[in-house]
């Protein structure tokens, strides 16, 4: 079992939660980043820094993650590519990406992108608070249990 993390955009709290689960459940965590990151010093965690470039980390994740593995990402177009490949994807707020919700998630993402470009809306998502941390931990537990049963 392996959990991949799009490390450049993932909140530290979510990364830490995945590592905590990995230590308990004995699986590998792979952080994929476009820039150097601080890697937790556990043998179950690997860091892969990809060459810089647009979507380099995304492309790496799509090429290397396989069905039965989980990718943590907040990038909706990346999640769409992963889900189309049969890979499970979860955002750091605890919402699972699925074939059933991808078109809606892409439409919302595109709407917010358009509104930001028109200056009608501010930057990124709200802060990653306790509610989001708990929702992520619950979803992570549920998905890991499901994937480990399927293995």
Curated annotation (Swiss-Prot):
CDD domains: PIN_YqxD-like
HAMAP family given in the database record: UPF0178 (MF_00489)
Protein name (record): UPF0178 protein PFLU_5917
Pfam families assigned to the protein according to its UniProt record, in alphabetical order: DUF188 (PF02639)
Bilayer-crossing regions: none
Listed InterPro entries: UPF0178 (IPR003791)
Annotated source species: Pseudomonas fluorescens (strain SBW25)
UniProt-listed PANTHER family: UPF0178 PROTEIN YAII
């Amino acid at each position: 079992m392996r959990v991949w993390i799009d490390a450049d955009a993932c909140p530290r709290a979510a990364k830490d939660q995945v590592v905590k689960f990995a230590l308990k459940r004995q699986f590998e965590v792979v952080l994929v980043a476009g820039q150097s990151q601080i890697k937790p010093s556990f043998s179950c965690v690997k860091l892969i820094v990809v060459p810089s470039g647009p979507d380099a980390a995304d492309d790496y994740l799509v090429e290397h993650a396989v069905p039965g593995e989980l990718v943590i990402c907040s990038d909706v177009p990346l999640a769409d590519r992963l889900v189309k490949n049969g890979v499970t994807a979860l955002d750091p707020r605890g919402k699972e990406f699925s074939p059933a919700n991808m078109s809606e998630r892409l439409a919302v993402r595109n709407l917010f992108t358009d509104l930001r470009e028109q200056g009608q809306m501010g930057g990124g998502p709200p802060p990653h608070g306790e509610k989001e941390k708990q929702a992520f931990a619950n979803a992570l537990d549920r998905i890991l249990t499901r994937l480990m049963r399927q293995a």
